[in-house]
């Protein structure tokens, strides 16, 4: 699985074994956080998880 991992859409990472979801969320409605995860993060505004390549755009 390949996910975006920075605020820039041209930078991606290959997820490690066991992390089968891409995610993004906003902290304080300003900062965008992206990456790979095993479970969807909770407790953040506008959290989105998905399971296809580069789906956390």
From Swiss-Prot:
Where is this gene product found?
Secreted
Q: What UniProt keywords apply to this chain's record, in alphabetical order?
A: Disulfide bond, Ion channel impairing toxin, Neurotoxin, Secreted, Toxin, Voltage-gated sodium channel impairing toxin
Please provide one cellular component term from the Gene Ontology annotations of this protein.
extracellular region
Q: Name one GO molecular function term.
A: toxin activity
Keyword Disulfide bond on entry: yes
Task: Report the SS bond pairs.
Answer: 3-22, 15-36, 40-49, 50-55
Tissue expression remark = Expressed by the venom gland.
Q: Does the keyword rRNA-binding apply?
A: no
Alphabetized InterPro entries for the sequence: Snake_3FTx, Snake_toxin-like_sf, Toxin_cobra-type
This molecule's function is given as: This toxin shifts the voltage-dependence of Nav1.4/SCN4A activation to more hyperpolarised potentials, inhibits inactivation, and produces large ramp currents, consistent with its profound effects on contractile force in an isolated skeletal muscle preparation. This toxin produces large muscle contractions and fasciculations in the indirectly stimulated chick biventer cervicis nerve-muscle assay, which are significantly inhibited by the addition of the sodium channel antagonist tetrodotoxin.
The entry assigns this protein to a family as follows: Belongs to the three-finger toxin family. Short-chain subfamily.
Q: What is this protein called?
A: Delta-elapitoxin-Cb1a
Report the source organism.
Answer: Calliophis bivirgatus (Blue Malaysian coral snake)
């Amino acid at each position: 699985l390949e996910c975006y991992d920075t605020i820039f859409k041209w930078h991606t990472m290959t997820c490690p074994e066991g992390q089968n979801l891409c995610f993004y969320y906003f902290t304080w409605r300003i900062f965008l956080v992206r990456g790979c995860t095993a479970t969807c993060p909770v407790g953040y505004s506008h959290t989105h998880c998905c399971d296809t390549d580069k789906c956390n755009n």
